[in-house]
């Protein structure tokens, strides 16, 4: 069985942001992001499942706990995945010890590897003084009560080790997009994770007319706790109002009231012909 510790970092320009997909759900989301593209970030997969790593197009990969799981996955056991991540802690540190200033850790909570390993990776990143943002999903109801309970425990654990945590409730997506098929439901979850990571990362990596940089993002997110974010789009007449209304009704908000937020960061994208 081949061991995977593959750090093929691009050499064209330094990238201070990493997006790490942990486990099956996180890996699917990062595969999707990699294909869609996010400007100037490095994508990474961490998994106990050697086969899933081999099948991914993402070039930077780390197999967790090779002696514990022997590349066969965590068997839906978060405690086994935690042990695997701890065994690979030095490799995780090496992965991050290259000038990384911000890391997004994305995982589907409720299974084994994402639920167990993501909090360990988050803890290591935070201990290295890297701005650490968790973006995780809670399962659909049809995935079963055990998985949901396991997911909530995982959310509680990762919340202790991140600067900011975005929790996306998959069941909320199903309520909003009621016509989704079984497979499209998981695809919509991947889309939502991708939008969340892309929206924050490209505030830093894409220069704007009124520029926001890493320091601005760090001020908002550092030790921010549970966070919510949203995106909205508008076109034609009253497009600004339409975009705001769209953002306020995004599934990313999970019915949360944004008006009690302690910090807010607003980023607006517009065409050159837009009037003030």
Where is each model-derived feature located?
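Tubulin/FtsZ superfamily GTPase core signature
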Residues: 1-276
């Amino acid at each position: 069985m081949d061991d995977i510790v593959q750090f093929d970092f691009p050499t064209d320009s330094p990238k201070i942001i990493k997006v790490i997909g942990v486990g099956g759900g996180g890996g699917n989301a990062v595969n999707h992001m990699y294909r869609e593209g996010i400007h100037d970030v490095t994508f990474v997969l961490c998994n106990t499942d050697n086969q899933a790593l081999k099948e991914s197009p993402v070039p930077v990969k780390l197999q967790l706990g090779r002696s514990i799981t022997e590349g066969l996955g965590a068997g839906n056991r978060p405690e086994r995945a935690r042990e695997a991540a701890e065994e690979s802690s030095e490799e995780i540190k090496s992965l991050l010890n290259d000038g990384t200033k911000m890391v997004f850790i994305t995982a589907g909570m409720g299974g084994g590897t994402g639920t167990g390993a993501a909090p360990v990776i988050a803890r290591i990143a935070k201990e290295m003084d890297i701005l650490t943002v968790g973006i995780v999903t809670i399962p659909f109801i049809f995935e079963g009560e055990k998985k949901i309970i396991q997911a909530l425990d995982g959310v509680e654990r990762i919340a202790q080790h991140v600067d900011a945590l975005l929790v996306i409730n998959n069941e909320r997506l199903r309520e909003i997009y009621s016509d989704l098929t079984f497979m499209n439901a998981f695809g919509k979850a991947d889309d939502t994770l991708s939008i969340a990571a892309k929206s924050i990362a490209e505030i830093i990596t894409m220069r704007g007319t009124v520029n926001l940089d890493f320091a601005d993002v760090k001020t908002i997110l550092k030790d921010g706790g549970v966070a919510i974010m949203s995106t909205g789009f508008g076109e034609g007449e009253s497009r600004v109002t339409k975009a705001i209304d769209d953002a306020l009704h995004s599934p990313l908000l999970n019915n949360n009231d944004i008006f009690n937020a302690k910090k807010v960061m607003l980023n607006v994208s517009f065409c050159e012909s837009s009037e003030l």
